[in-house]
């Protein structure tokens, strides 16, 4: 982790300490992304051939490569902390001590059980202490952790822990409302249900008034 930004390393360490890091095995050896994509493409070719798909067809010919590129560069890019967003934490010179809330954060992730889409929105709030964060950075942190194979409960807590670590305060709350395509597109095929998860820290957990203020913001979003 020595080549990572200080912020990325701190967040990773905090998640490991809380048992919230995504299950990852230690790499057998260092591998660059182009090699990783080449190997994934090869395995994807085998899977498609086992499904009796004709990869000589011009519609399917590049599919293994496209999937490999999508996995490494896009939907699973959050597995690599080298992609952790550059974070700007600013001294709280204005002494802001009221809740800051960001609603309707677009979130697209992947269910780690079936590798199909999780599609939803997040609401994130915090009460500043000594530092505030650029608002777009909250969206970027949500997107970073969404770009992994995930379960929604862990994703919610990872975002909370990352912001607590970076802002130096426990007063953070996160709520995610999402549709899981492992429920919508397979199995029970329920097209209308959604899952809501909430993780509360500091005053959001201990103060009923603060908690209710946050939950009202969440309900307003819904």
From Swiss-Prot:
Protein name: GTP cyclohydrolase 1
InterPro entries documented for this protein: GTP-CH-I_C/QueF, GTP-CH-I_N, GTP_CycHdrlase_I, GTP_CycHdrlase_I_CS, GTP_CycHdrlase_I_dom
Pathway info: Cofactor biosynthesis; 7,8-dihydroneopterin triphosphate biosynthesis; 7,8-dihydroneopterin triphosphate from GTP: step 1/1
Positions that bind Zn(2+): 111, 114, 182
Self-association state and partner proteins as the record states: Toroid-shaped homodecamer, composed of two pentamers of five dimers.
PROSITE patterns: GTP_CYCLOHYDROL_1_1, GTP_CYCLOHYDROL_1_2
GO cellular component terms, semicolon-separated: cytoplasm
UniProt-listed Pfam families: GTP_cyclohydroI
GO MF annotation terms: GTP binding; GTP cyclohydrolase I activity; zinc ion binding
Keyword GTP-binding found: yes
Reaction(s) the record says it catalyses: GTP + H2O = 7,8-dihydroneopterin 3'-triphosphate + formate + H(+)
Superkingdom to which the source organism belongs: Bacteria
Family membership noted in the UniProt record: Belongs to the GTP cyclohydrolase I family.
Transmembrane annotation, as ranges: none
One biological process term in Gene Ontology: tetrahydrobiopterin biosynthetic process
Keywords: GTP-binding, Hydrolase, Metal-binding, Nucleotide-binding, One-carbon metabolism, Zinc
EC numbers for this chain: 3.5.4.16
Source organism of the structure: Citrobacter koseri (strain ATCC BAA-895 / CDC 4225-83 / SGSC4696)
